[in-house]
Amino acid sequence: MRFAENNRISHRQLYRQMILALLAPFMLCIFGKGGINGISAVTGTVLALILLGFYVILLIRLTPAFDDLVKSAGGFVGRLIGIFFLLYVLLAGGYLLALLRYLVPASLITGVSGRWIAFWAIVACSLGTYKGMQRRGRMAEVSGGLLLGGIVIMLALCVPQAKAEYFMEALQWNEVTGRNIRQSFYGILCAFSAVALLPFLMGDVEKYGSAGKTAAGAILTLGMLLIGMELLLPAVLGYDRIKAESYPVLPLLDGADLPGNVLARFDIIWMGFLLYSLLFAIGSLLHYGHQIIRKAHLGTGRLW
């Protein structure tokens, strides 16, 4: 089904919303200085994906309880749960805005204050907060596949730049220790913490009881892309440089190009994909904040 009816979204739209909202934050923030790098990251990612598959099943079973938190958990506890999730949304949104504030002046538009960029970003994203889940689903239906396909093409174009000596350098088996695997495992779980918001979304999904495979499929897709990046980044840039770069995907984008150097600034296209995903993620957080306020009886959400 391409578009769901009755103000609900289809499983395909759910899948593409998850891809759109999480892809850019993952690509930009997980790797590099203080992040998850090396062969131990691959092992940690695989283990985290297995646990997340079971976690999704639990979240879907909890969906009816999240439809009205006050009714399900009582007035005090229900509102406390709502405040907890609302704080998460605020902190995550602030982090993404800070990321946007840094990336746009550094990579796309020079001479413009990052504060103004963050301000207009939040204004633009807030306009869609009350448009309903189905409109967000249709937006993801149209653009989600393009974004995913574009990122896959970007990775494919970067493969010829890989160097065998860099790749062998990244395969430092002496770093595959229990501690490093635990750190990578924990880091991936933290990165996927936004999955905890699924119960606030599933109520608007057609036949949400059978949407577990779809949500797990989106997580698996993102996980496979992460594993690909964990192997590609050190093979192209070198393991030592990866550990020194705050956002190693940016120099990776600089080197991505079509054969024959068809476009002089091909990296701008890829940066545009990531920027669009970041804006969708911020808009998603605003939408979930509105849902949390309403379902936890914290207000009407009109001022959100």
Regions found by a protein language model. Give the residues of each.
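Helix-loop-helix connectors at the membrane interface of multi-pass transporters/channels
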Residues: 97-115, 203-225, 284-304
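Membrane helical hairpin/interfacial module
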Residues: 27-116, 120-123
